[in-house]
UniProtKB/Swiss-Prot annotation:
Xref: CDD domains: PT_UbiA_2
GO cellular component term, pick one: plasma membrane
A UniProt-annotated Pfam family: UbiA
Name of this protein: Nodulation protein NoeC
Organism phylogeny: Bacteria, Pseudomonadati, Pseudomonadota, Alphaproteobacteria, Hyphomicrobiales
InterPro entries: UbiA_prenyltransferase, UbiA_sf
GO molecular function, one term: transferase activity, transferring alkyl or aryl (other than methyl) groups
Protein topology in the membrane: Multi-pass membrane protein
Alphabetical keyword list: Cell membrane, Membrane, Nodulation, Transmembrane, Transmembrane helix
Native organism: Azorhizobium caulinodans (strain ATCC 43989 / DSM 5975 / JCM 20966 / LMG 6465 / NBRC 14845 / NCIMB 13405 / ORS 571)
Length: 307
């Protein structure tokens, strides 16, 4: 039962850990529509930041729900067993309350952003619950649902900023996140095979699926690069020899990063989460820096052409 005295003994950081605030970086996807359209001035829009807060809150609620339902499997995992609910630092009842409060708080923020964003947020929560409850145990389907959840963030950002997103970029996003999700699965399978484990706990994959998952990583990743190139060719941001060259170079950088990530995952050298890998791996940071500089250059070129 809930007890205030008992709850007071739980360190505040334990609650924070359960919310996984480091994953809020993924909600930076809400700002992507503004950036790809070269409208940096719209980054200061209040609705956009309110949408960011919305997804931080609901995403944390879903992570809590995920950890609650995955406690049994996490306790058998070498690293996940240290999570707050798996290690029994937080009780199941505490997790239920945290989940409800976080999702409700996100819903309140979404309502203040308008009906369309509320509908997108509600769809995100519903799809997330379906994923946690059923789909994460289904092989391949889980990759596409995860991709849809990430792409929903981009749609939410476009809605909050009132910016249309080209279909070619949405196709790039969908395939890129299928690739990233499969890279994570590939890395997990490699590590389990190395440890002699029989299967991937709580997921629908077997060790014998290792090669086919690697194939999905590569094919989806390169398909994403093709859609990115299509977006570049159709985009008004890349006009003139220099911007077009920079845009194509950015496509090459993305292709290189995906290829390298697949090799790292195939070796089992990647961290369990691709986000941690992207922000800690030296080559990945160089790629991110290069892409950021290229994006700044394209926005500058667009501002000069408008001026």
């Amino acid at each position: 039962m809930w007890n205030k005295e008992w709850a007071a003994k739980i360190p505040f950081m334990t609650y924070c850990e359960a919310c996984r605030p480091h994953h809020w970086l993924k909600n930076g996807l809400l700002f992507v529509p503004v950036l790809i359209c070269g409208r940096a001035e719209d980054l200061l829009q209040a609705p956009l930041w309110l949408a960011f807060m919305t997804f931080c809150s609901v995403a944390s609620g879903i992570y809590v729900l995920n950890d609650l339902m995955d406690r049994a499997h996490d306790r058998r995992h070498p690293s996940k067993r240290h999570r707050p609910f798996a290690s029994r630092k937080l009780s199941g009842l505490t997790g239920v309350w945290m989940c409800l409060v976080l999702i409700a708080l996100g819903g309140v923020c979404a309502i203040n952003c308008g009906e369309r964003l509320f509908a997108i947020t509600a769809s995100y929560v519903a799809l997330s619950v379906i994923y946690v409850g059923k789909v994460r145990g289904e092989y391949v389907l889980d990759l596409f649902v995860l991709s849809a959840l990430y792409t929903t963030r981009i749609l939410a950002g476009a809605t909050a900023a009132n910016i249309p997103v080209p279909a070619s970029f949405l196709a790039f996003s969908a395939m890129a996140f299928v690739s990233l999700a499969s890279i994570k699965r590939l890395n997990e399978l490699t590590q389990l095979r190395r440890d002699g484990a029989p299967d991937l706990y709580g997921r629908g994959y077997e060790l014998s699926d290792h090669s086919i998952v690697a194939l999905i990583c590569v094919s989806a990743g390169y398909a994403a690069v093709v859609f990115l190139e299509l977006f570049v060719q159709m985009s008004s941001v890349a006009q003139g020899p220099a911007p077009i060259f920079v845009s194509n170079a950015m496509c090459v950088v993305v292709a290189y990063w995906i290829s390298r990530a697949v090799v790292q995952a195939h070796r089992g050298d990647m961290r369990s989460d691709t986000l941690c890998y992207a922000v800690t791996d030296g080559s990945s940071l160089v790629c991110i820096l290069g892409l950021a500089l290229g994006l700044v250059f394209l926005m500058y070129c667009r501002s000069q052409s408008i001026g």
